[in-house]
């Protein structure tokens, strides 16, 4: 228990009880589920949430036909961000965010996308598990204004000591990128309720982790 509380302090940067984190997760899951129902209704789908997920997994319109198509769609989202980012972020890094596919030797075991200083990697392996309706949220999280911009800007702040420019603090690093997914709504980047639903799917992943992590490691599930 003491070690788990230490891990919470490290990753959350606050002395929160596991029970409080668990309760927050449950509340977020309930809230996001309600928002998912709203987004689903806006698509015109008339079934249950489970049936909607099955529909999204099986309808070919939600998946790229080629690696090139997936990369082009990601590039288009990045270009749209470039056109509006100055209205939302006051100080931008000099380093642009470059788009590349995940290398072939890594792709089968890699995440859907990964962002670093001035870099956005998109996984084009096994396209039937890379839904296009989550691509705007993924791109906002990993590229700009997410990790790709966030880390590039931190590295350019030369007046700060190295430990502040290069140290990874999960609460800040991932918290900022998660906020960027939400910011996409304000930026007008979710064109359809399907894409807004994709953003909510990403939010739901994080909420479920709060519940499952504390359930396994503290509540003896």
Place the predicted regions along the sequence by residue:
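N-terminal maturation segment of proteins
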Residues: 1-221
